[in-house]
Amino acid sequence: MRIVIEKILLKFFPKLYFGLTRAQDSNDRYLFGFNLIKKNIKDNPSILDVGCGSGNFYSYVNSISKTINYTGIDFDYEKMSKKKFYGKKNFNIISKDLRENWDVGEYDFVWSSEVIEHLFDDKKFFEQLVKSTKKNGYIIITTPYLNSYLSFAKKYGWSIEPSKEEIVGHVKLGYTEQNLVDFAKENSLSLQDIYFISECNNFRSKYFFKLNNGLFCYIFNFLYYMGLFRFKRFSSTKKQINKLNYFSIAAIYKK
């Protein structure tokens, strides 16, 4: 019975399904990407999801338009157990080592969420994103915000030691606004805007990792949807905000 309910929710109410079952910061990022793509979409758009996992972002963008062509790439996708979308005509996932050079064509939108901080050679990785983007196309990335991470780490005793292993850990603790500006300059891109994602108060930041897993995650998600917690999912730098209250930073570039 549970599996049947999950399939119904996934098919007809994907944003609700992921909002209740996934960590809210992940859902915040997906809704951020969904809104930016919806705002800039044209006819029959193509989307490349770099570091796609099991392709959950497909459910969000497919709800914008059924003419979207979605391709995801990630490490060893064939070994993943969650293959919810196999059989969809506009859905494709390819196994690629994201540390290497990969050529999967050019796309209108290249989306990569919380991936770049897992790789030592971030400049090479970003160059691959640019190579995969059509002229006048868009690159959208999200990554932990370094300044807020260090602030939270000081308050709550989080580790400030980067991982020594790529992929499984964060080899970089995060990025700053200047880092995202530099990516644009180094690759001759137009930086459209910088955003901050997942607003946190003292409670959410203190228990951030607990609220992302297991029973605590489900309870928090339910209360979130009931309106007990009210956080901004994302906000542009054009608005007056306290940046240190946001967990992730994001940018949209035009090629």
Residue ranges and their predicted role:
Residues 140-162:
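Conserved class I S-adenosyl-L-methionine
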Residues 42, 120, 134:
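Short conserved AdoMet
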Residues 189-200:
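Conserved S-adenosyl-L-methionine
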Residues 1-105, 109, 113, 123-126, ...:
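Conserved N-terminal segment of class I S-adenosyl-L-methionine
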Residues 83-85, 150-155, 203-209:
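Short aromatic-enriched loop/helix-cap "lid" or pocket-rim segments at secondary-structure transitions
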Residues 124-138:
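A short glycine-rich, Lys/Arg-flanked "PGG" loop and its adjoining helix->strand segment in the class I
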Residues 162-179:
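Acceptor-substrate binding/catalytic loop of class I
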Residues 113-116, 142:
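Residues lining the SAM
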